[in-house]
A protein has these predicted regions:
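A short loop-to-beta-strand scaffold at the N-terminal edge of the catalytic core in hydrolase folds
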Residues: 22-34
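Acidic catalytic loop of the alpha/beta-hydrolase fold
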Residues: 251-255, 283-288
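Short alpha-helix in the alpha/beta-hydrolase fold that links the catalytic acid
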Residues: 260-266, 275, 286-298
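Short beta-strand/loop motif that positions the catalytic acidic residue
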Residues: 273, 279-281
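Catalytic active-site module of serine/aspartate enzymes centered on a nucleophile-bearing elbow/loop
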Residues: 294-298, 302-338
Length: 338
């Protein structure tokens, strides 16, 4: 979490869906490429659950469909990820366990302020993203339907299913079982809880067949245990526990129909999406299964479902894991931007 090559957009005090105020809110973001005179080459990339603007760089390049030589790419960090306003960096009264509940709606309201006020952009050519980033693309398209021309969510959903919610409760419980967690009021990181969080999460990130066929060896792990230790270390070394839980709650409450605009009428929210849409689920994704996207695709007017078959599961989209997925992703981008 030490990549300082980014910009800050000051939002001031933000009233949240919950009614609480997020004080002195800020978004951390990074741009790539140049905004053209027509301002019609904008591609927005939100961040995924353990993502950052830096990790989003794996989804574009000069030889990729999203190309900084052609597009003005805005990579925006999720509230709670340690770069944008988060429990770890909030004002003292909202630091740590005192951080308010954040929804997807809140995130996209803030991102809209950045895009419109900082860059005076009125149209976004494409919003794309993996996992929670894809969830944000749906939210953008429902919240600001006249502004978003195309979305490409992959391994994501417009509403978190009950099964997905239960999965998240499991990793949450593993973290919070550490006595050092202390209801979020810890002086030192809850190491045991963070390790347990990573260890439990690893079982969901990949499919059963991924382990059965020992695909983890392609990642350089000789054994399952070595993979699990790596997941432990990643969460201990890179993530604040309160930050993880803030984003987890945002994920659990993901529903594009939250708020006064739709009053939890999910189908109406889907029907109101005007953006040209391609959804790419993975056949073996354990928490964003294709069935959820099949339902969504029935109600989004201009939508195509392109299910990708891979035993990598949810992590098929992690840059570098599956070259075939990268090819499918770039084709979808080109089809949406043609």
């Amino acid at each position: 979490m030490n990549d300082n090559d980014y910009d800050i957009f000051e939002l001031g005090n933000v009233k949240l869906v919950s009614g609480e105020i997020l004080y002195s809110a800020k978004l951390a973001y990074k741009t790539y490429g140049l905004l053209n005179k027509k301002k019609d080459n904008v591609v927005l990339l939100p961040t995924f659950y353990t993502g950052t603007h830096k990790r989003n760089e794996g989804f574009f390049g000069i030889n990729r469909a999203i190309n900084p030589n052609k597009h003005f790419i805005i990579s925006i960090n999720l509230l709670g990820n340690g770069f944008s306003t988060s429990p770890s960096n909030a004002k003292n009264t909202q630091k740590g366990a005192n951080f308010p509940e954040i929804t997807m709606w809140d995130n996209i309201w803030c991102q809209h302020k950045l895009v419109t006020q900082k860059f005076n952009i009125s149209k976004i050519a494409l919003i794309a993203g993996w996992s929670m980033a894809g969830c944000q693309s749906y939210q953008w398209a429902a919240q600001y339907p006249d502004m978003v021309e195309a979305i490409l969510p992959f391994c994501a959903s417009a509403k978190t299913s009950e099964h997905n919610f239960v999965f998240l409760e499991g990793v949450k419980a593993a973290l919070c079982a550490d006595p050092a967690w202390n209801n979020g009021s810890y002086d030192a990181p809850p190491i045991r809880g963070l390790k347990a969080f990573g260890r439990v999460y690893a079982g969901w990130a990949f499919s059963q067949s991924f382990f059965r066929e020992k695909i983890y060896k392609n990642l350089g792990f000789a054994t399952v245990e070595s993979l699990l230790v790596d997941w432990e270390n990643d969460h201990v070394n890179n993530w604040d526990a309160n930050n993880l839980l803030t984003k987890l709650i945002t994920w659990q409450k993901n529903d594009i129909s939250i708020g006064k605009k739709y009053n939890r009428n999910f189908i109406q929210a889907l029907q109101n999406i005007k953006a040209k849409t391609i959804i790419i689920p993975c056949t073996h994704d354990l928490y964003f299964p294709p069935e959820d996207n099949e339902f969504e695709a029935r109600y989004i007017k201009n939508c195509e479902l392109r299910t990708y078959n891979s035993i990598w599961g949810h992590c098929v989209a992690n840059p570098g894991n599956d070259k075939g997925f990268e090819t499918a992703l770039d084709k979808a981008v080109n089809d949406l931007l043609e």
